[in-house]
Amino acid sequence: MDTYSINPAFIIDEAIDLSTRLSGTAFPVSIFPVKIQRIIREVHECHNYPTDYIAAAILTAIAVGIGNTHLVQIKQGWIESPILYMALIGRPGANKSHPLSFAMKPFLDYDYQQNQVFEKALAKYDELMSMSRKERTESGEEQFPQEPVRKRFLISDVTPEGLSLIHAQNKRGLCLWADELSAWFKNFNRYNNGSEEQFWLSVFSAKTTISDRKNAKSSIFIKRPYISVIGTIQKKILSELAKGERSSNGFIDRILFVMPNLQQKARWNDKELPENIEQEWNAIINKLIQQEYVLNEFGEIEPHILLFTEDAKRRLYEWQHHFSELCDRETNDTIVSIYCKLEIYIIRFCLIIQLARWTCGECDKTYIDTLTVERAIKLTEYFKESALSVQNILNENALNSQQQAIVNLLPPAFTTAQAIQIAEQNGMKERTFQRFLNDNIGTLFRKEKHGEYSKINP
């Protein structure tokens, strides 16, 4: 048996996740340090927000706190940023927005304070600019005052051009917080057809972006952009997300979906959130915000790059080889594309999890260790299952009434003969059903062995 498989920490993690699964939560909260696990538990018990939403929002907040200050290197020339595109899916009233507000509050507080500082500095700047150069010199002020910039983390609806300007002033990174994600992707074609979507495809990979502004002498050059995205979306409009080229150009595959098993409306209770919970969460994020970083001669951040220990890298490669075998057996190109993006995400998860543990005093940040890799694997498996569930919903939305009726009548596990009988009873010919079955392997159905199948979402 491998040494990492009998580590006591892994056994404790499994026990924690078993407990949460029994309560109807699939998100592996054991990936977080004990301090953050307690925060998630208290927020859930007090407000009845789904644990999946709280955990996903907290994961994204930690990623934003890291931003461009730390990167992870898997091998020479292959470096990843902790960029996440996260979508919380649920029915109206499913408490999707409130967990986001809790997780992002430290950034809101920071942005508010920085805006106060900016307003004062801007008033002073305007006052100086209203003076002549001679008057400024005589009063002991700078001859050529520098216009102040507003430091911030959070942005909402903004064009790529406006976003580039804000990012140039905030090189640590930004987070697009869209309460309704549908507004984000519906705006992709509002100006130049498809250009905004291409912008977000590039940002996901942290590719250099250049924005040429109208009537400007210089371009805005972002060497390594960092913009994470998080927001909510209703289950019934998921199909909007897959419209146009978004399902064929891999855009939708870059989104991490969170869809709790339990979609019940929260019941009110008398439990109050302990005062120290919000304080502890603020302290965790503020430690990330306040960490020092080095700027080079061009004003660019020199990130701290984390490598993997040999054991950690060995475990990661072992997982990837197994995952590649899944891809080789998969006949659905859409599913293969999702798996390929998850191979990128697992590296990013490693960085986020290691830094979360460091922030809570559970480890150092010299290397990414095996415990972090194991936790990243569990998180990746969670998002894999979520992505498959979303694909199933998208495919069901695309079914005609006859196909939908047959899918509904099929048992969770079935043979080809059973399925053909149900299909024929509903007016579908055998050959047509065989084609329908084969076309939906990996999205609606899973092939167990020759002649035997199961429904992905029974």
Q: Language model features by range: what are they?
A:
Residues 1-458:
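Phosphate-handling catalytic cores of nucleic-acid transaction enzymes
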